[in-house]
Amino acid sequence: MAFFDIIIRKKEVIYMSLTAGIVGLPNVGKSTLFNAITKKSILMANYPFATIDPNVGVVIVPDERIDVLKNMYNPERVIPTTYEFTDIAGLVKGASNGEGLGNKFLSHIREVDAVVEVVRCFDDENIIHVDGSVDPIRDIEVINVELVLSDLEIVTSRINRIGKKAMTTKNKDDVKEIELLERIKEALESNIPVRKLGLDEEEKKLISSFNLITLKPIIYALNVEDNDINTCLLYTSD
């Protein structure tokens, strides 16, 4: 099966929906990207935290298989694949400790299936940068470190909660979970996201309830000048 799963019932053909969170530092173009994808018109302002509450838009995803399935099963209705995008408030250094709108931001991002991280790659003195200068590599590191620290807090809390119980009772499931969490904790302490650990499906299922952000797939969207797309190469050639 391709990227989207399909459920076929007697009277319905249902395409599964996915969600993505558009994230990044404040004022880097997240809302601009959201508007372009969803064709909405939310506020785009030249100051940090123009977005407070998350904006949500749903896009129907074209799929050529839909006509084939309609002809095969002749369903009474077809529910197409949709992709729900959420424009989330900007993240700043210290977000994992509640700086800016950090805690609120992180609670929203845990609910999505994938992360789209918008990174500014152009200079414009008329557009404010929260850190005073444009440095895409630094900006990516700021966000990724905060996501790692947020996951680390959750993993550490869980280890502290069931660690003693697992050592005392020797419960097989608890011991298995602790061993996996210790492995994840060690990686996070080395600034390694969970998605790079190569977890198998059983391991992912074991930690699924934690909604670890760094386990989610991530796409980097580089915001460049309209008339000079090659400016991104200054920051990505390495």
Walk through the language-model features, giving the residues of each.
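Short, Lys/Arg-enriched N-terminal segments with co-localized hydrophobic residues
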Residues: F3-Y15
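Conserved G1/Walker A P-loop phosphate-binding module
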Residues: I14-V92, N103, I109
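Active-site flanking residues adjacent to catalytic metal/cofactor-binding acidic residues
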Residues: T86, V119, L222
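Short acidic, Gly/Ser-rich segments with clustered Asp/Glu that frequently serve as metal-coordination loops
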Residues: L91-V92, E225-I229
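Phosphate/Mg2+-binding loops and adjacent switch elements
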Residues: S96-I219, I229
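Conserved small/polar residues in nucleotide/adenosyl-binding loops
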Residues: Y235-D238
